[in-house]
């Protein structure tokens, strides 16, 4: 426990974990923007906190996440770095974060480069996971905006 109190946050912010992502992970606070949510999700992967990964995915997608596979992957992965390349506000409710996450598996360092979509629902930011089944373009958007998917999140993926 003391290690977490004195350790730098895995999100690479340079801050102590307890003053950075820990309040998010413990749901004492919520990230104010998509970039902070991205950093907190990276830290959650580094700390193998898959519950947080699920909780910060769009609520309509949470039941679709392969939780056991995510946990297995996290258990086999060591996260070694995060570079936020760009944070773009697309609208009041949508943002994109481009990042590179560096990780090691079986003593081999790899990089995951992604442009992620985030949506703000009821004053909280969530990750839109493109790897799970998505609505078709004419169905209601998964974020609950009452728009068709193609005119909301689907048009941004």
Swiss-Prot record:
* Record-stated family: Belongs to the UPF0225 family.
Q: Which SUPFAM superfamilies match?
A: NTF2-like (SSF54427), Sec-C motif (SSF103642)
Q: Which InterPro entries match?
A: NTF2-like_dom_sf (IPR032710), SEC_C_motif (IPR004027), UPF0225 (IPR023006), YchJ-like_M (IPR048469)
List the Gene3D superfamilies.
Answer: 3.10.450.50
Q: Where is the signal peptide?
A: none
Name assigned to this protein: UPF0225 protein PM1617
Give me the segments passing through the membrane.
none
